[in-house]
């Protein structure tokens, strides 16, 4: 019934098992990947033919987490998995990026890769097994695919690279780097780091690529024993006559368009060229009694011509699209405190890319609670990236963030995390929002720069400025050019684009996407060195506007006071059913967070209210000391004495014999409920019960006499 094939290989400290032939047999390819209780099922299905008129490659990758994988039932009313989480979206992108360049040019059949996480060991992140599984499923499917790829996670612990670390090991690592590639080439890098040098980062990439060969070899073995026949597919023959006609009609116009330095004017000119070429070809076809050529085909030829033109200009040492040389960063403008009521804000403009970045400070209650498959956790730092259609001068849909926005936001967040103050030094929750108001390339890196500036403007004591720069690389016939601070057009036309963020001391985030084979370690070294040069230039411009974090928080930011109490006293602050803390927050207008270790954080925009809440908490939690004198209040009277409250929640017995220096016949003759009386604590037993005395500090008669003196002084003379 089943023709099950299994391959096993050692991957770092883990054993990886690849299985096919038992589950999801109707898919084009299906592989079950197991790594020490983490199990993922990767499937791929491809349409047998492309849709008519299809002019792009419709690849979709969906990574899906099921809560049963962690032995849990989904929360919420419906008790069912809902929209993709941020983790699912980011992992889907992580898998998509190295796979997409390996499909042959001209292959437009729809391909869907779906990865389900079926079981999770909290120590083993499913993302690397998912990438290996997707690669293996494609490799055995017979679909045209120039793979397989391998994938590896690399940590850097105590000066050593570590392959596929566990979640616990990552906590002590200075690097979290994911690299994917084929036997001969690196295709994708995604990493965050604790301000490491270019050499260490590149070493991690090379180490990961060397180690992933074990996964690639295992996939080759799986294909040999379980692979399906390769498709008999070949790309459609190129219409050389049409290419020649389009080239002749467009060459002059395209060359003129790319002499225009301003984006909007250049785009307008290019649209005119496209329209003129289409009209000219239609006219020629009509004169020959033929149908006009397909518009999509003509547009694709024109795009190829644009790419060839721009690439050749750059490789020949001519100026780039906007007139710069390969190393120059576009002009930078920084304006701080743009929004009067925001806690911190910065308008960061680099050429035709602009980000309005806003920092907001909140309390512990504002932390994001993330119900992740590998365990729930709280996040005190959020960065949200938004790019509306007007940023590129277009109309479009406004709504929930798209995959691209989520990915760019995560990259910017990774860049800034290493410079954040420790939670014990700065107890605020921080939210950064980057609103991209103009875009012509490198908007995620503008968000990094703006985020760093906005936090400093808000008074967040980050350890250093962080700047980011987007780089491009063009490689042809042994010649290559590295481009600093690429434009949007250069992003599409290059062979490698990578983004580097960091401080003066080192890299905090690195993202690389390589579209071709042949980019060597030496080329990457040159590219990273040039990126550092660009980053340092940008950092210099940022320092000119603001050299360090402001010493004062915004007047509109909450003020925080921290006190430490005995953890056993927490119940006194909370009160029965939460009544005490609820009354405290309502009456003082503060937010109060209590940790299990007894740390209490009081937050309020009004510092006076925060101090009042602090005073009342100190009263609630103060320890009563034997021998100390307190101003008490009579709670109730007994035949043999009175119960007197000495502190909120603490009361004791004032025996009738300890009230006065004379014998009292009736307690009601000397005390009333609610009466204020000074008492001394003379004993506390092992259960915390208190014995009080007024007689020990002079007796009730002395207190009554002292109270009568000001009363007599106030009586008017006869």
Swiss-Prot record:
Under Enzyme Commission nomenclature, its number is 2.7.7.8
> Where does it live in the cell?
Cytoplasm
Catalytic activity, reaction form: RNA(n+1) + phosphate = RNA(n) + a ribonucleoside 5'-diphosphate
Top EC class for this record: transferase
Q: Which residues form the S1 motif domain?
A: 627-695
Pfam families, A to Z: KH_1, PNPase, RNase_PH, RNase_PH_C, S1
Residue ranges occupied by any KH domain in the UniProt entry:
558-617
| Xref: InterPro entries | ExoRNase_PH_dom1 (IPR001247), ExoRNase_PH_dom2 (IPR015847), ExoRNase_PH_dom2_sf (IPR036345), KH_dom (IPR004087), KH_dom_type_1 (IPR004088), KH_dom_type_1_sf (IPR036612), NA-bd_OB-fold (IPR012340), PNPase (IPR012162)
Q: Could you confirm whether the keyword Cytoplasm appears in this record? A: yes
Q: What terms describe the molecular function in GO for this protein?
A: 3'-5'-RNA exonuclease activity; magnesium ion binding; polyribonucleotide nucleotidyltransferase activity; RNA binding
Please report any disulfide bonds recorded for this protein chain, giving both cysteine positions: none
Claim: Transferase is one of the keywords in the record: yes
| UniProt main location, coarse | cytoplasm
Under the heading PROSITE patterns, the entry gives:
KH_TYPE_1, S1
The residues listed in the UniProt record as binding Mg(2+), with positions renumbered to this chain, are: 491, 497
Q: Which UniProt keywords apply?
A: Cytoplasm, Magnesium, Metal-binding, Nucleotidyltransferase, RNA-binding, Transferase
Named cofactor requirement(s)? Mg(2+)
Q: Name one GO biological process term.
A: RNA processing
- One term under GO cellular component: cytosol
Family stated for the protein in its record:
Belongs to the polyribonucleotide nucleotidyltransferase family.
Task: Please give the PANTHER family that the UniProt record associates with this protein.
Answer: POLYRIBONUCLEOTIDE NUCLEOTIDYLTRANSFERASE (PTHR11252), POLYRIBONUCLEOTIDE NUCLEOTIDYLTRANSFERASE 1, MITOCHONDRIAL (PTHR11252:SF0)
Which purpose does this protein serve, as stated in its record? Involved in mRNA degradation. Catalyzes the phosphorolysis of single-stranded polyribonucleotides processively in the 3'- to 5'-direction.
**Name of the molecule in the record:** Polyribonucleotide nucleotidyltransferase
